[in-house]
């Protein structure tokens, strides 16, 4: 969000991996470190956070520089010049991607009342963080008490989750 605007902001961000331009991404220019880690995990470029040796976002919030402990091959063949990970954009390069996703097997439940409390808390936090409109939000709850949460928001709904 811009300090003088009540509308959500979107910017074209360049993502460099090991000194090479990997792609351009359209997203809200906030929480870019967290976004980069989630995006790299989601694309299968890294398998865990520890694969990243360093990660820096430039002061102008237009470039993300990531150095990995391993080389990645065929960068230019895997990604389009601009990734639009939100509505109507984005890409999954292969249906094989879905075959590698493991089914979640969990007995975890969230009573309806707890879900309502969590949603209310999420929207209160969102109002404090971003008083404007035109954004999507997502939260990850603390499994123990369902109240502690990490909030993410972005112009693109998929980016809010990443």
Where are these regions (language model features)?
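Intrinsically disordered, low-complexity regions enriched in acidic/Ser/Thr/Pro/Gln residues
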Residues: 1-151
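Catalytic beta/alpha-barrel core
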Residues: 154
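Feature captures the catalytic cores and cofactor-binding loops of soluble hydro-lyases/lyases
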Residues: 157-162
């Amino acid at each position: 969000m811009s300090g003088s605007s009540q509308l959500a902001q979107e910017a074209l961000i360049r993502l460099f991996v090991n000194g090479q331009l990997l792609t351009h991404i359209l997203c809200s220019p906030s929480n870019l470190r967290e976004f980069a880690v989630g995006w790299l995990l989601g694309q299968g470029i890294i398998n865990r956070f520890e694969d990243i040796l360093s990660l820096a976002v430039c002061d102008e919030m237009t470039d993300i520089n990531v150095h990995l402990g391993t080389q990645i091959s065929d960068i230019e063949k895997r990604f389009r010049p601009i990734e639009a990970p939100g509505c109507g954009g984005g890409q999954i390069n292969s249906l094989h991607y879905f075959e590698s996703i493991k089914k979640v097997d969990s007995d975890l439940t969230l009573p309806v009342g707890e879900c309502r409390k969590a949603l209310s808390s999420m929207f209160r936090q969102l109002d404090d963080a971003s008083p404007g409109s035109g954004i999507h939000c997502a939260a990850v709850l603390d499994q123990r008490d369902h109240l502690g949460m990490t909030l993410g928001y972005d112009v693109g709904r998929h980016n809010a989750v990443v």
